[in-house]
């Protein structure tokens, strides 16, 4: 049909809609942010123990030909026990035909599983930083991160204590604990915080401060080191009410034991020949020494 001016009026009713033939991942953390900064180990069997030996001291000799003085050597064990994880998706046997020109999402699903694995690694590492470590001969003694290795949410260097986010004072407190514990100065010190802590840190510094440009670059991502800590941002850090637990640690302070990610693709005859894409992993992490980890409580109210 045409109008009085000869313009076809029904043509718009037949305009087509184009559909993308590919799949795009929605926003998410795609790579592990912490795995590179812990000690990676392999594991066989249901559990693994790590032998530890404590510091000893020498005694001055004051007499000639005196009986040899024997002192016991303090030793310890740390245990790690892997947990199994999986993720499975089904692709119906008719999906390839029904999707038409749209490709089957098999590759994007496998990529999605790998991204989930990366986030799981980070969550397990974070859990080990502040969680319970098992020690003793049989690994049944629960060892918590002591209060002496924690910077309180209301910590101030002077004046009246008040809840706060991440401050320069809290960073100094964490550094002091590491220095007091004689943490090897050659070991890289990692600081895991969320986006809110980076903003808080910038807010607490005056523009005229000599630290301002460094923190500004830290927030902008142009710099990742400040006050001797390499900063890693993670939104997976635990939060209770308005208080988020952030962590400072060194690489030797945490072990992540893994068997790697395995992905299986099988046709399920019991499910109408659907294609099953299933990824499995076995993971565990343990805090190796309490003195190598500092928990910093940050208010996000």
Spans of features found by a protein language model:
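Structured, hydrophobic secondary-structure cores that serve as assembly/anchoring elements
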Residues: 49, 55, 76-107, 171-203
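Residue-level signal for secondary-structure boundary elements
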Residues: 35, 121, 125, 137, ...
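Short, catalytically relevant binding-site loops at active-site mouths
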Residues: 131, 196-200, 237-238
């Amino acid at each position: 049909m045409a109008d009085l001016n000869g313009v076809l009026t029904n043509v718009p009713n037949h305009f087509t809609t184009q559909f993308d033939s590919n799949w795009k991942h929605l926003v998410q953390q795609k790579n592990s942010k912490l795995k590179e900064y812990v000690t990676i180990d392999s594991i066989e069997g249901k559990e693994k123990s790590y032998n530890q030996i404590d510091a000893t001291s020498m005694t001055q000799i004051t007499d000639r030909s005196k009986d040899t003085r024997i002192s016991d050597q303090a030793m310890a064990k740390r245990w790690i026990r892997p947990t199994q994880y999986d993720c499975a998706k089904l692709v119906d046997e008719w999906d390839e035909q029904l999707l038409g020109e749209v490709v089957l999402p098999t590759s994007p699903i496998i990529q999605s599983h790998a991204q989930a694995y990366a986030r799981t690694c980070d969550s397990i590492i974070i859990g080990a930083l502040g969680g319970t470590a098992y020690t003793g001969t049989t690994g049944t003694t629960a060892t918590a991160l002591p209060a002496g290795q924690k910077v309180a949410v209301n910590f101030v260097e002077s004046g009246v204590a008040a809840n706060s986010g991440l401050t320069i004072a809290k960073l100094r407190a964490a550094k002091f604990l590491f220095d007091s514990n004689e943490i090897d100065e050659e070991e890289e010190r990692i600081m895991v915080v969320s986006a809110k802590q980076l903003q808080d840190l910038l807010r607490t510094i005056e523009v005229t401060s000599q630290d301002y440009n460094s923190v500004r670059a830290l927030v902008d991502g142009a710099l990742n080191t400040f006050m001797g800590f390499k900063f890693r941002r993670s939104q997976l850090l635990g939060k209770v009410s308005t208080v988020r637990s952030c962590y400072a640690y060194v690489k030797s302070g945490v072990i992540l034991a893994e068997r790697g990610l395995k992905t299986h693709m099988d046709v399920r005859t019991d499910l109408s020949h659907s294609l099953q894409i299933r990824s499995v992993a076995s993971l565990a992490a343990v805090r190796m020494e309490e003195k190598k980890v500092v928990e910093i409580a940050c208010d996000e109210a």
